[in-house]
Design a protein with these regions (language model features):
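Conserved, charged catalytic cores of large soluble enzymes
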Residues: 1-42, 46-48, 63, 71, ...
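Function-dense linear segments that define catalytic or interfacial modules
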Residues: 24-117, 129-133, 210-211, 215-239, ...
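Catalytic alpha/beta core of large soluble enzyme barrels
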Residues: 58-60, 99-104, 187-188, 196-356
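Internal maturation/activation junctions in enzymes
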Residues: 91-114, 118, 122, 139-201, ...
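Short cysteine-rich clusters marking metal-coordination/redox-active sites
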Residues: 379-382, 395-398
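Cys/His-rich microdomains that often coordinate metals
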Residues: 385-386, 402
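Short Cys/His-rich "knuckle" micro-motifs
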Residues: 388-392, 405
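Short Cys/His-rich micro-motifs in 6-15 aa windows
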Residues: 398-405
């Protein structure tokens, strides 16, 4: 059909919402953005309403604006099961100064973009490795303790980031659009219009072998590829492996069993206390995913890129309730994905030459909801399998990646 054939149609808000929910249930698209929530925390309202975000949904910007991102690897801030909050504060301060300097040295070919960037001096400091941090501290992702840890970690970063921006403003001056911002009436000096953002970190988290963004670990052990001969290579999360070795439980056969199940929830050899800590994405009921995102959002200037995972047999109504809960909890956006809802998926937790094994969900609200068979998708560069994280396909062998919008 040509554009001339398009006809106008009247639709109610409820009908549109229902259509969005059904489409998201069908294949994960579209993601949803709550612009009212976005503009409640618009740091520069004098520039007008914010109407759009970047493809991954974590960065809302005015027309022509940009934001330089950086991420702190939280897995490097745990010693003997305790989080080093003072060191986290110091690294945050240094990261803010670095990103502020990046604004000064970055050049853009479009004058409008350069003007917007220099006018607002936005930076987007975020995190990765939160799932690993929880493993290291012995805290389950889908627990009240996990939510509390999220609040504490992000609050420490948020407070240190804003304090540092105020210090830089005293040294070098406020950002040029300061008079149009929410900071002017408060008489608070500020070098940057906004400071914190949680990006997907799909590629860089692979480079540093940590969990991505605020996501739970997707799989503790999974099939990676064939090595010389008929041997199969399995990747195992190093924190999980170390915990098993400390208890004298580690073996290649056990890792193979974990990979086949996709989770430790129903692996008899794993102690119950470890099962509560080492949960993976599909062990976690959707409401816990939403609650975790909301906990971080309360301490983030911009927004958060995160996927709310659903088991294959989740209903349309369950997806609808996730959207409603997200709105009620103050999220700025939400992306959902029902396992097995696309014809081609890009993550496998087991040897693709063998029959798929269903792994049941052990969370209260998701009993008996299994993971669907996941098909392998090849990397176009090296022909190895791709992994799916936060809407991005990633190759662990050559580094190739792409994101679905």
């Amino acid at each position: 059909d040509s554009i001339q054939d398009i006809q106008e149609e009247t639709i109610t808000a409820k009908e549109l919402f229902t259509e969005i929910v059904e489409c998201a249930w069908h294949n994960g698209e579209p993601g949803i953005v709550f612009l009212d929530a976005v503009n409640k925390t618009n740091p520069v309202p004098g520039l007008g309403r914010i109407e759009a975000c970047n493809p991954c949904g974590e960065q809302f910007l005015h027309d022509g604006d940009v934001c330089n991102l950086g991420s702190i690897n939280l897995s490097k801030f745990v010693t003997n099961g305790k989080v080093e909050f003072e060191r986290l504060k110091e690294v945050t301060r240094r990261a803010v100064r670095m990103l502020d300097n990046v604004v000064d040295i970055t050049e853009y070919p479009v004058d409008r973009v350069t003007k917007a960037m220099q006018g607002n001096r936005r930076v987007g400091l975020g995190i990765m490795g939160f799932g690993d941090l929880l493993y290291q501290t012995g805290i389950g992702y889908n627990t009240e303790e996990g939510i509390a840890m999220a609040e504490k970690v992000m609050d420490v970063i948020q407070q240190a980031a804003h304090q540092t921006s105020q210090e830089i403003a005293e040294e070098k001056g406020n950002f040029p659009n300061y008079d149009l911002s929410v900071y002017k009436p408060q008489k608070v000096p500020m070098r940057n219009a906004a400071l914190t953002t949680v990006a997907p970190t799909g590629t860089i988290s692979m480079m540093y072998d940590c969990s991505s963004g605020i996501e739970p670990v997707f799989a503790l052990s999974y099939y990676k590829g064939q090595i010389i001969g008929s041997n199969t290579l399995y990747y195992t999360n190093p924190i999980f492996e170390n915990a098993l070795r400390e208890r004298g439980l580690f073996s290649e056969e056990l890792m193979k069993k974990v990979a086949e199940h996709g989770s430790v929830a129903h692996v008899d050899e794993i102690p119950e206390d470890m099962k509560k800590t080492f949960v993976v994405a599909h062990d976690i009921a959707p409401i816990w995913h939403v609650r975790m995102q909301a906990a971080f959002q309360r301490h983030v200037d911009n927004s958060i890129s995160k996927t709310i995972n659903f088991p294959h047999d989740a209903s349309v109504e369950e997806v609808k309730q996730a959207y409603i809960s997200a709105y009620q909890m103050g999220l700025k956006g939400l992306t959902v994905y029902r396992d097995g809802s696309r014809q081609v998926e890009v993550l496998t937790v087991q040897d693709p030459t063998k029959k798929s094994v269903t792994a049941e969900n052990n969370s209260t609200n998701a009993q008996n909801k299994g993971m669907a068979t996941q098909q392998v998708h090849e990397c176009p560069n090296c022909k190895k399998e791709l992994r799916m994280q936060e809407g991005c396909a990633l190759c662990a062998d050559c580094g190739y990646s792409y994101c679905s919008l």
